[in-house]
Every structure is written in C-alpha cells, then in structure tokens.
Amino acid sequence: MTSIAGVDAQTIEELRIASKECLDRGLLVAAKWSSELLLSISSTKRNLVRSGGSLATFSTSTPARSLSPAPPLHSFVEQSPTSPRIATQPAFQGPVPNLPLSQQVLETGTGNLPANTPEVQEDDSITAARACFEGREFYRATHILEKCTSSKAKFLRIYCQFIATEKRAQRDWHKLDNNRHQPPLPINEFLNRLLDLVKDSTDPWLLFLKALFLSRLSRREEAMESVLLSISGFKWNWSAWSLLGSCVGDGEELSSLLHLIPLPLDHPLVQIFQIKTLNELHNPSDHEISLCDRLLGPDFFPNSLWLMSMRACALYHLHDYGQAERQFEKILALDPNHIDDIDIYSNILYVQDNRLKLSKLAHEFLALDKDRPEICCLIGNHYSLRAEHEKAVKYFRRATQLDRTYLSAWTLMGHEYVEMKNSHAAIEAYRRAVDVNRKDYRAWYGLGQAYELLSMHHYSLHYYQRATALRPYDVRLWQAQGMCYEEIGRVQEAIECYKRALIPADPHEITINLKLARIYRSLNEHSEAVAYNRRVIEVCQADSRPVQDYAKSCLEVADYEMRVPDGDLNLAREYLELVAGSNAEDVGRAAEMLKLVKSMIHNRAAILPINRAETLFS
C-alpha cells in the first residue's frame, strides 16, 4: 500500500466542495474548518487546480493510517453533551450507503447537477431557508422546507428542528436554576421523534444527523456506527469527525477505532482526527507532535493555523510550556485576531507566572470580542494570577453562561473556589464539568482536592482514582492517592502509589523518595528507608544542590551505618562531615554523631589487628 505523499488535486477539490456543502447545510464550524484548511495550501497549488492544471508531484494512490482525539460538536449551535462511556467497541458492519448523488457532488460540484434533480429544483426554497437559518429563525426555516424532498432540504429542515428544540430544552432547564429539581443536563424530549425521521436514511448527511441524535440519547455504539457510515459517504464533513471523537472514551479505544475508519491510516483526515482526539483526552505524545510536523510540511497544509494550534495544545499537555508558548506566538504573528484556543495560551502564561504578557494579552483580546468564552477564560486567568479570585470567578461564570458545555471554564471556576477555601462551591463547579465531559481528568482531580479540604479522604480517594484511570502517567495523581491512603492509615497502599509515581517522575525528583523513606522508617524497615535516602543524596549531589536539601537523608544513612553490624563507618563519616560543615539546621546533631563515628572507627581499627592475630594462631 502506497502512503500518501501530500495534498493532490483531488483533495483540493474535495475541500472546496466540502466547504460549500457544509455551509449550505448550516454546519458553520465544519465549513470554517474545511475552508481554512483549504486556504492553508499554497495558492500556487490551489490556482493550478482551479485552472485545470495537474499536480504531478502530488499524485497519490492509496493512503495509510494514524490515531486521534475527540473535539466537541463545534458545528452545532447548541453543543451536545458527551455520551457515557461503555467498554465495548462498535462493529463497523453493514453496507456502505449507496450515495450516487453525494458522489456526483464530489465529482462535479453542486452547481453542475442535472436540472431535474430535486436539489436543483428546490434551490430557491433551500436558499430562503438558509437565510432564515442565518437569522436564527429556525421554525420558519422548517416551515419553508416542509414540502421539499431533496436530501439537502431534508437535512436542513431536521437540523433546524433539532436546534430549535435544543434551545427550548435549554430555556426550560434554566427556568429551574437554583432549584434542587433541576436535572444535571437539559432534556430534549423531541430527540426520539427526530431520530425516527432519519433512522432509515442512507444519505451521509442524514446519517450524520442520525449519529448526532443517537449520541444525545446516550446510544454511543449505534452513534459510532452511523457516523462511520456517514464518513464513508462524505469524508470531509468535520462535524462527523468531531462527533466520532466525542464518543471515544480513552486512548486504547481510539486505537481500536482507527482500524474501523474507512480511510487509510496515513490519510490526513485520520491523522488530524488522532491529533485532535488525543488532545481532547489530554493524552498526546511525541508521536502526535511528529504528525503535526508532517501535516504542516510543504506537501500538506503548511499555513494551517488550526494545525499549529493543535501542535501548541499537544506541547501544553506534554508540559513543554516553552515550545508551546513559542508556537502560540507564531500563530498570533500570522493572525493577531486568532481567538481559537487562546484560553490554552493563557493557561501556559499562567503556569509560567508571566503576568506582564498575560495582562497584555487580556487587554488586547477583550477589545476584540468580550462575548467569546475563550476570551472570558483568558480574562479569568488574568485576574486569578493577580489573586483577585472573585473577579476571576465572575469571568469563568460568564464563560459558562455563553457556553454551558465549555469544560475549561467549569474546571477553572472550581480551582478558584478551592483557592478561596469554598469547598462546596468548588465541588458544584467540578460536578458541572464532569457532567459536560466525564473524560477530563482535571475535574475528577479537582473533586478529590475539594473533598480533601473537607477532610473526607475516602471521597477524595475515589475521585483521585477516577482521574488516575484517565491519566495513568501523571505523577500528581499518584501522589495525591498516596497522601489519601496515608491519611486513612492504609500505609502499604500509600507505598504502592508513591512507587507508581516514581515511574513517570522526573529523574531529579526527590520529594517522593523522601516520602517513601519516611514511611519505611515509621514501619521500622530501615534498610528500605536508607535505600531511598541514598537515592536522594545521589540526586542532590549530581545536581550540585545545597547540603540543606539532603542533610536529613545524610543523617539517616549515617545513623543506619553506625547501628548495623559491619556498617560502612567511613561513608557515615563522609556524610556527617558534609552536614557538620554546612549551615543546615542539623549541624549540632551532625557534629555529635561525627564524634561518635570517629570513635567507632578508631575502636574498629584497634580491634581489627587483634582479630587478625587470633585468626592466624587459631
């Protein structure tokens, strides 16, 4: 199987058609995504294709494959919540839909369809309905398309009905604000009726709607099967990929799903899907960075700000804040008005404690659009870094009012309440985050912290375990679990957690080693305690740290060597001399122990010749 060498004429034409088809159906974010991806291809290639030329250097045969993460349903006016995760994988079985009209659109474009097709004959009605859609008159658009029979008109009619009923469900839900009878999420009672309208469809766009309704009804497996069928019929509908990603529970499930996608593994769409989904799962790796670099190469989409943003987000999740910051700076240099993922950039500046740059960014973007949730989060981070937590909460709450499904805002609001020692409000914010997306470890971790503030360690432990299951290589989560186990007296489990934390920890880390040494000492397992103290000393000396950082470990090792038979007294003396000659707080104790160890060395030296003589004459 030949791998894809780059973007070819067919890909360029498909992106052009996808932009128009998505726009005609009201999938605005999908249309924006495909058109921006098209613009990221060099104008020379695009113009050559438009003029009927040939991209000989970009000819391709069958593409190969890759892995990816789950974006939210950005293409929907009301973003639907994530369906609950289930363990089994959907089987991609059943026929690929027979979609002659869709294929004709891909080959010729909508404008070249025969005049007798329903879509062409209903074009005036579709145009009028699209105008109503743009004016957010969804019921009126539905009425205009009531007697239309083409698949495009049917899609737009049902999609308008969906948006209208979602808005109604939102209004009814908000009527119960601050009421204990308010359900966790809005309930759309019309979903089953809408599903009945598309349940037997074979059109890829209607299959997408079917998958959307199934996902909202928490029928995840069926939703995944329908969206895979939709992708097989029209692969450049980004909303379908977003919906598919929202159904993915973890990295393992994603790996299994990739083999069910009806595209080669190295197809750009599959690789883009992998990058986005793993970012959404907060679990990218260096492999995703290399995929971004490949797709940003001259043969693919060298000017794609979206891919650059995905690369920056992956670096952020990998805690490479310096490179992530430089990537965002490059994005803003190319487009100073680029708002997407600006909240991630603000998180990076927050972590780096870069107050000046964060303040400048906040003032610049507040002037651009104060009603974007990303910008509200940016302003919230700005106030949080200045320790103005009440103002930070105000802006994070504003972000959730603009988009109830905006996960970061709920999580950051919870963090602010923790800073304010308002555990109950923090728990409420984190629970809202979990309701939006159960795959985000940060909300589970936040719940654990909030319950820890209330000294409810069993509850904390439960939530830390949920977070660890989603992010098994995060040092903080294992440390948090270990501390909870210590608090409830389950010392052996605490030891296991701290040992597990050492696996992904920085090789120069000493805190966890010190905790393990302390626990083993409390259990009178002195040899184990000394082993971890020696590790602390080795790391500190290799890093040329001040003696104060490892003085206690030196004393512990020296004390052990002085107590055990045939202990290494010279090593004990070396460590004690280090501490005694420093300005550590244990200087006095080190000086006393040094006198004792010198006496022991002298006595051992005196006894040794006698023992040798006895051995010779025995």
Give the ranges of each region predicted by the language model.
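Residue-level recognition of tetratricopeptide repeat
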Residues: 150-155, 203, 237, 267, ...
